[in-house]
């Protein structure tokens, strides 16, 4: 991953909500494994983690804010859409559409028709000048349709090769619009 020009950032040591969170331990383990300084953090399920805690652990940025509303999860409608700073930490939120802050997170690509998803990405690019999207490797697995995994149909119907194709078409469209792909570390100016 590192030799391919990709950034390794932390998703914590544990994937619980906040109980057992260990951003410092995760950072140390990843740095030992990769030989690279880990500057970024994104909490599991985009849970709230104190900026002071992350800064004290040595992180430079947090990308755990989804500036939208998700019932029973969080209401971040008043959170900034673009980079802000708190406790010596850059806060780089996940992208949402403009003006209505429709979520552009991983589930959206599964369930939305690609033309609609692209239109929402276009609105975010126009408003914010960047896209900060995230996906999980397991989403691209063809095994999600296996009932043993218990993945809901609304996610598994567009997974594996179907999601790979949709994602490839999204990337090609973004490239055709002149979008530049980079690491978050580079975008925020923390490149080593």
Regions flagged by a language model, labelled:
Residues 1-99, 115-192:
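Catalytic alpha-helical scaffold of carbohydrate-active enzymes acting on polysaccharides/glycoconjugates
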């Amino acid at each position: 991953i590192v030799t391919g020009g990709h950034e390794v950032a932390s998703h914590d040591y544990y994937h619980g909500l906040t109980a057992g969170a260990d951003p410092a331990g995760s950072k140390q383990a990843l740095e030992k494994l990769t030989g690279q300084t880990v500057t970024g953090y994104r909490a599991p399920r985009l849970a709230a983690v104190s900026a002071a805690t992350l800064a004290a652990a040595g992180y430079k940025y947090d990308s755990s804010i989804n500036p939208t509303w998700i019932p029973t999860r969080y209401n971040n409608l008043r959170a900034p859409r673009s980079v802000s700073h708190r406790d010596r930490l850059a806060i780089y939120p996940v992208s949402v559409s403009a003006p209505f802050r429709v979520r552009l997170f991983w589930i959206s690509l599964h369930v939305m028709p690609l033309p609609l998803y692209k239109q929402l990405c276009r609105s975010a690019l126009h408003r914010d000048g960047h896209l900060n999207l995230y996906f999980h490797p397991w989403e691209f697995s063809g095994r999600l349709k296996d009932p043993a995994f218990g993945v809901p149909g609304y996610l598994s119907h567009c997974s594996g090769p179907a999601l790979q194709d949709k994602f490839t078409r999204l990337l090609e469209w973004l490239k055709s619009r002149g979008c530049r792909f980079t690491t978050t570390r580079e975008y925020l100016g923390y490149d080593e």
